[in-house]
Amino acid sequence: MSNIYTDLSSAELVEQAISRKEGRMAANGSLVVNTGKRTGRSPMDRFIVQEPSTADAIDWGAINRPFDAEKFDALWDRVEDYISTRDRFVSHLHVGADPEHYLPIKVTTETAWHNLFGRNLFIRPERYNPADKQEWQVMNIPDFVCEPERDGTNSDGAVIINFARRKVLLAGMRYAGEMKKAMFSVQNFLLPEKDVLPMHCSANVGEDGQTCLFFGLSGTGKTTLSADESRFLIGDDEHGWGRGTVFNVEGGCYAKCIDLSQKNEPVIWNAIRFGAIVENVVIDDQDRTPDYTDVSLTENTRCAYPLEHVEKRVLENRAGEPSAIVFLTCDMTGVLPPVSILSKEAAAYHFLSGYTALVGSTEMGSSSKLKSTFSTCFGAPFFPRPAGVYAELLMKRMEEFGSKVYLVNTGWTGGPHGVGKRFSIPVTRAIISAIQSGELADVETEHLEKLNLTVPKELEGVDSVLLNPRNTWADKEAYDAKAQDLIQQFVENFKKFDVSDAIRAAGPSLD
């Protein structure tokens, strides 16, 4: 006889998870789980059902891989049959904190801990679906084994989004990040139709009520820099920007745990307590203390906690439009300056480019080897529409509100990776502080010709030598050669975009 557990509290789900041996309790009160062979996202196993209502609007390719509609229905039924004879957990949650733009979702999971993850990362509304919208169904069944020949999948696991049916199927997937990113992809497709820009960014608000956004790929500092004790957190990863508002798509945070320390990241450290989930972190067998330096299971160790675990947060989970926008890049070549001031055209150029390094990548098969990458919109794996749709919406929003945009390099200085050193968190925090206070909007600047970037000549709390990257290299000719190589990469990557001459001219130039 199977049981259906509906809308259990976090404490009840923790009880269930431990009694079912899904995880162990750590000394800090968090639930520690192991996700098995998949310790990151599996991009080759992610699909979108190809059907008439959305087929023409999706940017099909290596990221948005098509899946047959009939095969989806058959697989969904098969998974439903499998779970119908087993215990399962159901929660009713929202995706999107805006009363107009939320999606109601029914989350069904095979494990208690995946249901707790859903409760931590999605929004637990006071009242479910007050606008009586059509419900989305998310089914996450990690012990179901897909058969590629029969099911049309790529492997034994799959994440499949079906817009026509309003369904998301996760089968054979234990890594919980797939669940949140699948619903982010759904909102990334739906929100632009409503004149809302979906963004892979973190967001916080100062005492002065000014909102600041941080765009960036995994490991560039989105979560760390937005978790600022002097400011109020909106969210750490996914937001929507509509007229008059920036709202969180989520109700929790999914932070990296590698080398986590109370000194450097107190907000995250303190959030890991009872009700939080810690993924793939090794704990001491006796006293159950987590060892955040141990990466024997994966470098992509994670913690998932609800926003209620953050003391200084925006209670409404949304705020006003951003006065400052930060594009975080981790430049492993040591060529880019620590901070640049961007025009709106340059902002569009760098938003489309999404240049960074894959640092502690969240994708399966990624090792600790660093490599440069261009990830459109600073989150290419999650955006189903063509990139231009998002870039145009960004420019529109910036023009209407007058937001200032900055490119901040959290990567290397004084030489490339292996020669130079990485910017320290305190230096980056000093730069962010100058951006948020408005200091950077009114400083003496210089122009770096070939990179086509405007940088400040001096900044309080930052050694002036660091501000022009060429000055930090002992071998200036080596810097020039490295810069030329990086500029070439920018130019080559940007050839694929069909944009105005003004945007193209705002990027680095070989001339």
From Swiss-Prot:
Single Gene Ontology MF annotation: metal ion binding
UniProt cross-references to InterPro entries, sorted A to Z: PEP_carboxykinase_ATP (IPR001272), PEP_carboxykinase_C (IPR013035), PEP_carboxykinase_N (IPR008210)
Highest taxon in the source lineage: Bacteria
This protein's record includes keyword NAD: no
Record keywords, A-Z: ATP-binding, Cytoplasm, Decarboxylase, Gluconeogenesis, Lyase, Manganese, Metal-binding, Nucleotide-binding
GO cellular component: cytosol
CDD domains for the chain: PEPCK_ATP (cd00484)
Cofactor(s) needed by this chain: Mn(2+)
Annotated Pfam families: PEPCK_ATP (PF01293)
Binding site for substrate: 41, 175, 181, 302
Catalysis: reaction(s): oxaloacetate + ATP = phosphoenolpyruvate + ADP + CO2
Principal subcellular localisation of the protein: cytoplasm
Binding site for ATP: 181, 200, 216-224, 265, 302, 428
Cofactor detail note: Binds 1 Mn(2+) ion per subunit.
Pathway of action: Carbohydrate biosynthesis; gluconeogenesis
Record: residues binding Mn(2+): 181, 200, 237
One record GO biological process: gluconeogenesis
Compartment annotation: Cytoplasm
EC id: 4.1.1.49
Function description: Involved in the gluconeogenesis. Catalyzes the conversion of oxaloacetate (OAA) to phosphoenolpyruvate (PEP) through direct phosphoryl transfer between the nucleoside triphosphate and OAA.
HAMAP family hit by this protein: PEPCK_ATP
Homology family: Belongs to the phosphoenolpyruvate carboxykinase (ATP) family.
Complexes and interactors: Monomer.
Name this protein carries in UniProt: Phosphoenolpyruvate carboxykinase (ATP)
Organism: Hahella chejuensis (strain KCTC 2396)
